[in-house]
Amino acid sequence: MKKIISLVFMFISCIGIYAQQIMDATAAYKKANDLLERLTIEEKALMVRGYNKFFIKGFEEKGILPIYLSDATQGVNIRNNLPDPNVVKQLERSTAFPSPILLASTFSPDLSYQYAKAIGEECRAGGIEVLLGPGLNIYRQSQCARNFEYFGEDPYLVSQMVSQYVTGLQSTGTAACLKHFCGNNTEFYRKRSNSIISERAMNEIYLRGFKAGIDAGAMSVMTSYNQIDGEWAGQSSYVIKNILREKLGFKWLVMSDWNSVWNLEKVIKSGQNLEMPGSYNFGESVLGLYHQKKITEKDLDDMVRPILATCIAMGFYDRSKYDLSLLDKYQEHEKIARQVAEEGIVLLKNRDNILPLDPTKNRKILLTGKFIYEIPRGYGAAEVIGYNNVSLIEALQRAFGRTVYYIEKPTVADIKEADIVLLSMGTRDKEAIERPFALPKEDESLMRYVTKNNPNTIAILNTGSAIDMSAWNDRLAGLIYGWYGGQSGFEALTDIITGKVTPSGKLPMTIEKTFEDSPAWGYLPKGASLYNELKNEHLINVYDVNYGESVLVGYRWYDTKNIEPLYPFGYGLSYTTFTLIKPRLSSKKMNDQMIRCSVTITNTGSQKGAEVIQLYLKENQPSVSRPEKELKRFKKIFLNSGENQTVEFEITPEDLAFWDDETHDWKVNSGQYSILLGTSSRHISHILSFTKE
């Protein structure tokens, strides 16, 4: 029997490697001051605006090289449309990794490290110094069509995945950019929204992932499009100076999102460093403010200095732009992408163990729906085309031969004659829009039509958020959430369908029964159409997004309000079975020291597989309204049939804390607490109690 200790912060073991690669802030700022003295006021004005759409301006004769910034979290978006394409030699190809929400479904910070490291290596090969990711906005509501770029609804899960992402990416010498800071949880006219978030919710939910990324050493942050309490985030001194720099301790480069700021004087004095992508007259406007004495040269120095210090600390000015040796690692990157897909695809339903399907059986397997030949992906800045893309029908026919056959528009007879129907559905989610909590109308019609006529229907859903499944979920025999699996996603999916791989993915968010159940229900302005027309965005009045649910985001809302979800946070099935036994606490009293919680997990089924042990905490008699439970630890365990392991978690007083709006600080109450151990937010096996003295 093995014993595993789950560390409080899983990135700690990697910080030593990271710290050896990046210069200390004091030394970097000293060198930055030396460079700053070489720049004229005109050069400083040019340096605080973007150049060539995705670059930081360089002055090579002064030892300052142009720096390339490129999207995004799920791989390198190869940009062949730069105003001046000769500034950089673009990669010929880049790996299309699974979407970050699929990565979050693995519940594996180690995979997050490997995933980001592989992306960083492709950045280094392509001369990209700063990757514009990870995106880590909290999944607040299911209609946000950018949820696929993020890591789900729980701040602890987000923090663990992001800290390892940052560490993995920056181990390659590529700078991470945490985005979008902050309160950017809807894409509905995002340049016209004003997020109203309580101090407590901001600290307990929306800042925690950013804090984890900063603590892991992230070297840049991108501000968001929206307003925070009535001021645009990218020009808000409160957001940048007070929260990001003073409260979270961020020392490095801050950039605006593209075309997201409006008042130049506020931008310059807010703590912002870099206006992107750089309006054509920005430099002249800066100099105009300077000559009008509305800003000083010190104001510009304060903007430029963190840009220089960040580039110096990362070694951007002292190294070869391209590391072409890393072009040999694409095959390794493909393997990582496939492993992530294998571990992140979620099996939600498996009636009568219809899955896995044995390829040696002579059955008629009808394939219909969408994404048959097309690779599903999210669109916008994060889009990655990939290479060696394998379609769904290609992957399935490799495994099953011609027993899998495709009919675009099957008749009732076609559907009834099939032994199994594989029904592929999904959405094409995209930055800058919201999408309905539903399949497209034609897909919904086909789903109802097929499930009505064949009880052995297995649905494959490729999407970036939850969707309404109320009309047909009960009629399905099987349901697989495939997300956006990247270039190898359908190969991984096929391995799960055949049983070559046992599914182990877990939902990083809740799938509600109806959108009306969501804590964000009613977030759109009264009378607004979901289908926003971006060309008219400037005509839309600024509207408030009131985060009235406060800290009750995701499962915190459903559990506390006793609303039954369709599928709960942390849920996902396997082809084998597990039991949790022998839960123990090292002490039933906590003072100022940690206590340990251990539990033994056994694979009681016939297949090897993996389970995610989830540890939630609850204050039994809180002094303020608190969630029914909060995720504090998790660990993914791989076991052969019959094997068992004992897992030990460390719980600290800090894990009991909530944000006190009166003292504006974290507070820990004395009293009774419960530890809940289980395999989802709604599947709790054991409850243990202890007293905080």
What spans do the regions from the language model cover?
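Short beta-strand elements
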Residues: 683-693
